[in-house]
From Swiss-Prot:
Residues 1-232 are annotated as: Alpha N-terminal domain (alpha-NTD). One of its GO terms (biological process) is DNA-templated transcription. Homodimer. The RNAP catalytic core consists of 2 alpha, 1 beta, 1 beta' and 1 omega subunit. When a sigma factor is associated with the core the holoenzyme is formed, which can initiate transcription. This is DNA-directed RNA polymerase subunit alpha. One of its GO terms (cellular component) is DNA-directed RNA polymerase complex. The gene is rpoA. It is an enzyme of class 2 (transferase). It comes from Porphyromonas gingivalis (strain ATCC BAA-308 / W83). SMART domains: RPOLD. Gene3D superfamilies: 5' to 3' exonuclease, C-terminal subdomain (1.10.150.20), DNA-directed RNA polymerase, insert domain (2.170.120.12), RNA polymerase, RBP11-like subunit (3.30.1360.10).
Amino acid sequence: MAILAFQKPENVLMMETSDSIAKFEFKPLEPGYGITIGNALRRILLSSLEGFAITAIKIEGVEHEFATIPGVLEDVTNIILNLKQVRFKQIVPNADVEKATIVISNSEVFRAGDLNAQLSNFEVLNSNLVICHLDKSATLTMEFSINKGRGYVSAEENRAEHNELSTIAIDSIYTPIRNVKYAVENFRVEQKTDYEKLLMEVTTDGSIRPVDALREAAQILISHFSLFAENKIAIEYVDIVDTDEFDEDSLHMRQLLKSKLSGLDLSVRALNCLNAAGVDTLGDLVSLSRSDLMKIRNFGKKSLTELDELLATLNLSFGMDISKYKLDKD
C-alpha cells in the first residue's frame, strides 16, 4: 500500500536576520508537527551546541575564590560571576583553547574588552561587560584559560583539568544561544485549515549566526534519529543488578544534580523563593513539578520561565525521577 505524502515545507523561510537574531518560518506542517519539531529544535539549540568559555583563573596573591583583593571593590566570587558571562568568538580556525595573562593597572574599571589585547585565537563579544572596579593605585594580575565545550560544565568538573596550586576552576556556560522562542499557528492548504505553521526566533551571542545554529541543531537531531531509521536497532538482554557503582554518565549527572542553585545564573527573586522553600540544589529543583513550584510563596510565571530555560540548557526537566542516582548516599 502506498504511503500518503506528508505536507511539509519545500524550504525554510528566514526573516529579519542579523548576526545574532533571526526569525524562521516552516509551513505547511501536519497537525501536531509544529510543537514536535519546535520543541525538539529548541531543546537542542539551548543545550547541545558548542561554544567557548573561561574554565579557570589564577589571580596573583589569591589562594581561593572566597578571598578579597586589596584595592578591588568586588570580591573574587563576584569577579568569577562576571567572568562566567564573557562571550567569545573563535577567530583562528581549530584553535579551541588558549591561556593568557592580563595585568590591569592605572585603571578604575576592568572590562571584558580588556582581554582582547591578550588573546590570539578569540575575540570578546560583550566588550562593555564590567568585570570589576579598582582603585587607581591597585594592580590586578590574572591568568585565565579558555576552552571549547558544550552546554554547562560545573567548577567541580573543570577542577579535574585545572588542579594547579592557587588555580580556581569556575563554572563554564558554553552555549552560544541566548534565547529560542517558537509559536505554532493554524495554516490553510486549499480547503483544509488544520495544518500548522511553525515560527521560530533564535538569538545567539554573536559567535554563531542563527541560521548556522539552527542547521547544527537539525544535524544533531538527524544523526540521532538516523539510528532508528537505518536498521541499527539491536535487541540486547541485560541483567539488572542493584549496585551503588555508577558509570561515567551517571557520575556526571549525579554531580550536576548536587550543584547548588546559588552557583547558577538565577535572578535574586527566583533564588530567594526557592531557598525559602528548601530547594537548594538542582536535584531538589528537578524533583518538583511545575505545579509544585507555582505553590511556592511569591513564585510567579516569570520565575518559572527562567527555570524552564535554565533546565533546557542543562538538558534537565521538571518531574525527573532521580532516585537511581542515590544522591543521599555520599
